[in-house]
Amino acid sequence: MLVWLVVLGLAWWRFAAISGSRTFQYDEWNFVLNRWRFEIESFLRPHNSHLSLLPAAIFFVLFRTVGLDNYGVYQAAGYLTHFTVATLLLHLAMRRVGIRAALPVATAFLLLGSAAENSLWPFQIGSMASLAGFLLALTALDRDDHRSPGLLAIGLCVSLASAGFGIVAVAGVALEAALRRRAREYAAAVLVPASLWFLWYLSYGTSEMQRENISRVPEYLHESYAGAVAALVRAPLAWGFVVAWLLLVALLIAVIRQPQYHLRVVTLAATIAAYWVLTALSRAQHWAPLSGRYVYLAAPILLLLLVELASLVDRRTAAAGLLVFAAWSVTSTWEAMSAHARWLREWGDSVGMELRVLDSRLDVAPGNYRPDSLRAPDIYADSYRAAIDGLSSSPAFDDAGSTAASRAARADADRVLYELGAITIETAEAAIVCEPGTESAGELLLRSGSQLVMLTTGPAEIGLRALGDEPLPATRVQAPGDRAMRVTVDARLPEEQWRLMLLSADARACFGS
């Protein structure tokens, strides 16, 4: 197990190195803005129809202990949850093929780049914990001793309290208990968590299933299966369909030949198939079966099915074959993880810079103002103000983060500055005459708190920028040329040194105060 600890350490180093410093992402803002208060709704309110009690509790504790300005702690919580899933996978595989063959399998999952949407994003603690609970319940069934019912109940409680995957986890575990002829011994361990979830559903539950998705289920299930198989080595989807059918045939042969020995195959196949069916019924209209968050849930199950096939040969051969597979998987999906990390950093840079501006202008921002409806659609100025005041911390970038922010992020900050009135440009009543030889072209520096009147020598496009390198479309204005324009810059952040640029070819202007 020392080797596994070293592998986990290397994985942590890689995740931290490629993730860098960023802030909360997309759905996480729903938790930040709506679940920071200590009230029952913060924990029991569903998220996209999922019971999210456990992830909401984890985020709440972190909100209250480390605040909103230490996102690295949230990332660490996500890594630990992912490592728990990988370790449980290792333990289950060890019981079938031994440690030498199990290590490559667990490592392949640990570093699976095509599932980075979960492993690198703390919000997916819910999905990962739900899967971990299922694997813990399977571990309890494998032990099958006097402590197993309690361990199984804990696993199912964790799974149900974390995400919707817990529903199929309960069904899969119940199926295996029945196939093992141990249904009576495990009945309470299954029924108690299921009953608690049902009581929650009666009060808070919602369903996103749509009748029109019924006809889409077969195709969605087929593509989800093939896509998950292909994602293990980042192969084209067409090859995924071929290999998926070959794997299915091999598993059927194994079950037919040794039905009692391969009961786990039935459990795993039924569980993931049920998950894909339920996902199709509720999400097929969005058609994202190849998304990394779905691949993540399927990958350990597919790897355990592969382990079942490997158990048919001697352990030395199994270890060699699985080592080759793991090397293929890690190397082929390595860049996919790096690419997803870059995307997360880019989005985080933009939101962090936008919030830096919003923090400085909350006193003038309308309550319904949204700085970024794409990357952070849940952020409204009033709810954001309440959260940072209530938690006495802000997720906005500090000076160091602002300095290191990308070009695109700084441009997004300019947009928010402009939308919140940091600079205004309007028709002026004052008269100004451009005397020949007094016009200027190019770029003019406008310091904080300044005001000037300008007149272009003809119709021209004016661009404004402060933190960005180029003016955004939102900060471009058409000057008529026959009327003066007044430009006013208010005084807020010291780095807001606005620049006025004449963007039209051969455009010139003269200025007055």
Feature names for model-found ranges:
Residues 13-15, 114-120, 160, 198-203, ...:
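Transmembrane-helix signature of polytopic, lipid-linked glycan biosynthesis machinery
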Residues 53, 71, 75, 103-131:
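Aromatic- and kink-enriched transmembrane "portal" helix at the membrane-lumen/periplasm boundary
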Residues 134-150:
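Membrane-interface transmembrane helices that cradle and orient dolichyl/undecaprenyl
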